[in-house]
């Protein structure tokens, strides 16, 4: 298994956010790219009152603690000025982790041969959820092989990249070894408390 070529930080994501998370992504993504990082995912949850989780990485898939700190220092003031949350929130900056989301075609290429869970936004032959070994994309599709397919059912599917709603790697011993070899094991999260403008201290 060989590493896929590095992709430019501006490779477009296949899977993007909606609502408030989409607004956060719109604010922070240009600055992340300016620092040499690329956005993986934004999530806004009700954890700890309100938590904004921003997942980022370098184009080679690495993300150190120092990288998380640099990202936090840069984007925290941007979020304070634009105030997309509208209330006090807890900011978390993290690496994608070993069982990372797959949000770009390059992610599927980089981790070809590893196990992943994929959920389609549009059903294929009556099903939306797949778990199996992903292959490198070919054009607009990516193949997923299903080792545990029942007799009489397809052992693989060609999934349209544009139809993927969510995808992430499955944590396995092989994946852990490969992540450590590549130096893409997760960095410690950088966390901070942020108040919406005008909120009491």
From Swiss-Prot:
<feature type="region of interest" description="Disordered">
    <location>
        <begin position="180"/>
        <end position="201"/>
    </location>
</feature>
<dbReference type="Pfam" id="PF17384">
    <property type="entry name" value="DUF150_C"/>
</dbReference>
<keyword id="KW-0963">Cytoplasm</keyword>
<keyword id="KW-0690">Ribosome biogenesis</keyword>
<dbReference type="InterPro" id="IPR003728">
    <property type="entry name" value="Ribosome_maturation_RimP"/>
</dbReference>
<dbReference type="InterPro" id="IPR028989">
    <property type="entry name" value="RimP_N"/>
</dbReference>
<dbReference type="GO" id="GO:0006412">
    <property type="term" value="P:translation"/>
</dbReference>
<comment type="function">
    <text>Required for maturation of 30S ribosomal subunits.</text>
</comment>
<dbReference type="InterPro" id="IPR036847">
    <property type="entry name" value="RimP_C_sf"/>
</dbReference>
<dbReference type="GO" id="GO:0000028">
    <property type="term" value="P:ribosomal small subunit assembly"/>
</dbReference>
<dbReference type="InterPro" id="IPR035956">
    <property type="entry name" value="RimP_N_sf"/>
</dbReference>
<feature type="compositionally biased region" description="Acidic residues">
    <location>
        <begin position="188"/>
        <end position="201"/>
    </location>
</feature>
<dbReference type="Pfam" id="PF02576">
    <property type="entry name" value="RimP_N"/>
</dbReference>
<dbReference type="GO" id="GO:0005829">
    <property type="term" value="C:cytosol"/>
</dbReference>
<protein>
    <recommendedName>
        <fullName>Ribosome maturation factor RimP</fullName>
    </recommendedName>
</protein>
<dbReference type="InterPro" id="IPR028998">
    <property type="entry name" value="RimP_C"/>
</dbReference>
<comment type="similarity">
    <text>Belongs to the RimP family.</text>
</comment>
């Amino acid at each position: 298994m060989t590493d896929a070529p590095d992709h430019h930080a501006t490779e477009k994501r296949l899977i993007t956010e909606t609502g408030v998370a989409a607004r956060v992504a719109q604010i922070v993504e240009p600055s992340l790219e300016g620092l040499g990082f690329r956005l993986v995912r934004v999530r806004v949850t009700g954890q700890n009152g309100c938590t904004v989780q921003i997942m980022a990485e370098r184009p080679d898939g690495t993300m150190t603690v120092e990288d998380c700190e640099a990202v936090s220092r840069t984007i925290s003031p941007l979020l304070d000025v634009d105030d997309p949350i509208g209330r006090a929130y807890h900011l978390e900056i993290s690496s994608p982790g070993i069982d990372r989301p797959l949000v770009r075609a390059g992610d599927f290429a980089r981790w070809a041969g590893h196990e992943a869970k994929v959920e389609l936004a549009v059903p294929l032959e009556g099903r939306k959820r797949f778990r199996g070994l992903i292959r490198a994309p070919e054009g607009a599709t990516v193949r997923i092989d299903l080792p545990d397919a029942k007799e009489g059912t397809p052992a693989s599917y060609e999934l349209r990249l544009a139809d993927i709603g969510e995808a992430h790697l499955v944590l396995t011993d092989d994946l852990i070894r490969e992540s450590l070899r590549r130096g893409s094991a997760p960095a410690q999260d950088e966390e901070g408390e942020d108040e919406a403008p005008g909120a009491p201290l």
